[in-house]
Amino acid sequence: MSEFIAENRGADAITRPNWSAVFSVAFCVACLIIVEFLPVSLLTPMAQDLGISEGVAGQSVTVTAFVAMFASLFITQTIQATDRRYVVILFAVLLTLSCLLVSFANSFSLLLIGRACLGLALGGFWAMSASLTMRLVPPRTVPKALSVIFGAVSIALVIAAPLGSFLGELIGWRNVFNAAAVMGVLCIFWIIKSLPSLPGEPSHQKQNTFRLLQRPGVMAGMIAIFMSFAGQFAFFTYIRPVYMNLAGFGVDGLTLVLLSFGIASFIGTSLSSFILKRSVKLALAGAPLILAVSALVLTLWGSDKIVATGVAIIWGLTFALVPVGWSTWITRSLADQAEKAGSIQVAVIQLANTCGAAIGGYALDNIGLTSPLMLSGTLMLLTALLVTAKVKMKKS
């Protein structure tokens, strides 16, 4: 695809950035992220309304990640000759449809179907987002355009959980998803108005993506990515029941905790470039080690609200290094195949999200309230050890 993009650039001679299109892509990304994480802050009322346990309701996150995993790997190959403009419009339609199906769900099955639609949009869009952005601006402006996309991600992560918690208490969880559907409609119209025709990849450009895993240190890196994100979702998916029952937070208190978590994540993302300049490998090993210690502290002393709030802030600040750090690892260690490596990374992250949320939910329902924390801490510790021992890092 990278060769095709280069050819296309030469043919189209992009001289001026299409900022309206870039911002439409960023807005779509933000909406996808917000809707992906809405169940985290609405888990309890969703479970009560549908007559299921919170652990089962958490599988609405699992199915989204599971479908997104396959979408990220195969959608770009399936639609390689299709104009990307129409594909992005389709993803925005799926986002809107997902929100409506969830808001009108009267059964767990319909809820899962709605969340599966989101998974298709999420995985497919993420697999294409970088290459889309590169085709909307001149080469010199690509870093700035990508910063707009990832800035939208950071903002979405800041507001998703606390906004969902606040609005869920105010208007009910179903109306929260109805409001999200309105955002989806705005995505559709903005994309139709601003995104130009972007021809798909010719069939002769097709290459074997998975061959990258044979390179030294790449498989270890992907396993480390899997464990770190599985550990994150084993904890974060169930932050509402853990914090409300372990630390005794009410809805208002939980909203403030989630807001603090989001702000800390935004700050961590903003500071990550300075930390990664010093040592990417140290960041990739040190961040999960800090998170493992944080999980232990929350398990032992989480009944104290100050401790619980502090852990949430530290967690948000520290985990922000993880996705940025692994993206930096890919651009340095797999620079010649960064797009294909990115597709594998998205699939690994979504598989990790699936497994983390699923096993965390099982542990919550069958072992105990703090079991998702212990699972998360163990995975983070293993990640730190694996990065230290096996992950290779090329110098910039």
UniProtKB/Swiss-Prot annotation:
Membrane topology (UniProt): Multi-pass membrane protein
Mutant phenotype after disruption: Inactivation of the gene leads to increased susceptibility to purine ribonucleosides.
Periplasmic topological domain residue ranges: 43-54, 107, 169-175, 237-255, 303-305, 365-366
One Pfam family here: MFS_1
Keyword Membrane listed: yes
Impact noted for substituting V158M: In strain: BEN2908 / O2:K1:H5 / APEC
Induction behaviour: In stationary phase.
Impact reported for I267V: In strain: BEN2908 / O2:K1:H5 / APEC
Alphabetic keyword roster: Antiport, Cell inner membrane, Cell membrane, Membrane, Transmembrane, Transmembrane helix, Transport
Annotated consequence of substituting V322I: In strain: BEN2908 / O2:K1:H5 / APEC
Ways its activity is controlled: Reducing the electrochemical proton gradient across the plasma membrane by the addition of the protonophore carbonyl cyanide m-chlorophenylhydrazone (CCCP) leads to a drastic reduction in the rate of inosine excretion.
Biological process terms in GO annotation: purine nucleoside transmembrane transport; transmembrane transport
Outcome when changing V293L: In strain: BEN2908 / O2:K1:H5 / APEC
Cytoplasmic side: 1-21, 76-85, 129-147, 197-215, 277-281, 327-343, 388-396
GO MF assignments: antiporter activity; purine nucleoside transmembrane transporter activity; transmembrane transporter activity
Chain's role: Involved in the efflux of purine ribonucleosides, such as inosine and guanosine. Adenosine may also be a substrate. Confers resistance to the hypoxanthine analog 6-mercaptopurine, however the level of resistance is rather low.
NCBIfam families assigned to the protein according to its UniProt record, in alphabetical order: PRK10213.1
Family according to the record: Belongs to the major facilitator superfamily. DHA1 family. NepI (TC 2.A.1.2.26) subfamily.
Family matches, as PANTHER family: PURINE EFFLUX PUMP PBUE (PTHR43124), PURINE RIBONUCLEOSIDE EFFLUX PUMP NEPI (PTHR43124:SF5)
Protein name: Purine ribonucleoside efflux pump NepI
Organismal lineage: Bacteria, Pseudomonadati, Pseudomonadota, Gammaproteobacteria, Enterobacterales
